[in-house]
Amino acid sequence: MPCVQAQYGSSPQGASPASQSYSYHSSGEYSSDFLTPEFVKFSMDLTNTEITATTSLPSFSTFMDNYSTGYDVKPPCLYQMPLSGQQSSIKVEDIQMHNYQQHSHLPPQSEEMMPHSGSVYYKPSSPPTPTTPGFQVQHSPMWDDPGSLHNFHQNYVATTHMIEQRKTPVSRLSLFSFKQSPPGTPVSSCQMRFDGPLHVPMNPEPAGSHHVVDGQTFAVPNPIRKPASMGFPGLQIGHASQLLDTQVPSPPSRGSPSNEGLCAVCGDNAACQHYGVRTCEGCKGFFKRTVQKNAKYVCLANKNCPVDKRRRNRCQYCRFQKCLAVGMVKEVVRTDSLKGRRGRLPSKPKSPQEPSPPSPPVSLISALVRAHVDSNPAMTSLDYSRFQANPDYQMSGDDTQHIQQFYDLLTGSMEIIRGWAEKIPGFTDLPKADQDLLFESAFLELFVLRLAYRSNPVEGKLIFCNGVVLHRLQCVRGFGEWIDSIVEFSSNLQNMNIDISAFSCIAALAMVTERHGLKEPKRVEELQNKIVNCLKDHVTFNNGGLNRPNYLSKLLGKLPELRTLCTQGLQRIFYLKLEDLVPPPAIIDKLFLDTLPF
């Protein structure tokens, strides 16, 4: 094997790598005379071109100052940077060019163009120059044939023309791999392996990398640069190109939410779901307040008002209907006692105006309503067989018929009202004597109160407990002037728009009250207080009592009026007893004697 040895000569400070002196010993000698000024200009031009590196790898010449290099061919390489040692010789040995051709993308060459394998020793010049000496990257035919330098120059001219046309930077990694020399190596060195050139479009390359033009490679001298850190991890070329070419997605903007983040009611921004539907905070609060307050809205248009972010407050009726249309569930809204508390016991109310109604009055008022409904005739089963609206009816017939009709209506209502009283919670727990006393004392009051609530005073219809419907004029001869007071009371009572729950409480309070001769007045008073509290809670929370502060007082004020009407009824019975046209029934006679105030 022929041995080729090249030596660096000392060069002046600041000289370019292409102008270094070389000595070649084997079959011939080449001196620095071959490096003509045009080649020196070639190196200087490449050094000054606008070639920017897109990677942070150190220049190749930096490594060549401190390591011995051996060429070998392998697949795409890993970069392993050992710690630099002292300056040493660089050895290139045993290059198998046929193996190199198998892994490279260069076109095959003939054996005449292949250089002989051997060893080339590079020794640092003395004294060392501040510039990094140039190095021979590959064995090219130019060392065997002087004419190849001319071919190399032609390739460079073509390459320079292509570099000027295409300026788009492309990230490309070096085609060399480095590894630590095995132990026992006399000098601190690393192994360098040359991989096949990577065929990519020609663009400005990083300094010190290789350029491929028409299947041939050439080395670009690396300018003097500061040595970089040696602690790079392994990196594959394919992975690096994917990382550099992949565009990093920008983070989503907060100001432009997707359709999934819009309110289903008005289209405003919505962070999460409320009451089963993704809605904004405004529509959530509107829906909650409407359900908790049981608010009733009225649309001033055609009930199809647009509901969007700008016009959602114009029509509350259409906004609430749209909340229901998109699927918001009213049953999910928590009551006032659990407002704002998830899975925790309700605390004391924040203000005295918003107490929560206790559960026992709720069950009490339900029982009172049930008792009232069961003791009243259904509107579909009323008896109009004796109803006559003829004003001359009061002049016809005998007085005994009208008086007997009066007694029959009282006795028929007595059994129905007694059945109603027995369904009041707590009434049957009282002593029997107290039950009878309370019932007999309040019978006429209950008769008038229930009759006034059922009847229609505007049309003059009076509906009694047994379902019989009579005109007011049909009752004048039997009831006397008492019927006019009952109709007037009925008109005033219905003008108050009392609901069935409040009326059930008023009817119970008319009977459960303090009477003279009670055995256990304390128990009666306790039951009375329960009913009063139940009525108060109902009026406050469910009947708009907050907007009508005197409404409860007006309801309780009807009880003294009933006492006055009861006295008028006793006077009518007393007059009929004196007239003695029709003897009163025994139960009516007993009722009259037991309820006399004197």
Curated annotation (Swiss-Prot):
Gene name of this polypeptide: NR4A2
Motif (Bipartite nuclear localization signal (NLS1)): 287-314
UniProt free text on domains: The ligand-binding domain (LBD) contains no cavity as a result of the tight packing of side chains from several bulky hydrophobic residues in the region normally occupied by ligands. NR4A2 lacks a 'classical' binding site for coactivators.
Location in or out of the cell: Cytoplasm; Nucleus
Annotated InterPro entries: NHR-like_dom_sf, NR4A1-3, NR4A2, Nucl_hrmn_rcpt_lig-bd, Nuclear_hrmn_rcpt, Znf_hrmn_rcpt, Znf_NHR/GATA
Name of a matching Pfam family: Hormone_recep
Compositional bias of kind Low complexity: 8-22
Motif (Nuclear localization signal (NLS1)): 338-350
Originating organism: Bos taurus (Bovine)
GO cellular component: cytoplasm; nucleus; transcription regulator complex
Zinc finger intervals, NR C4-type: 263-283, 299-318
Motif nuclear export sequence (NES1), residue numbers: 443-452
Transmembrane feature ranges: none
Ranges of the DNA-binding region feature: 260-335
Name of the protein in its database record: Nuclear receptor subfamily 4 group A member 2
Annotated spans, Disordered: 1-22, 337-361
Subunit record text: Interacts with SFPQ, NCOR2, SIN3A and HADC1. The interaction with NCOR2 increases in the absence of PITX3. Interacts with PER2.
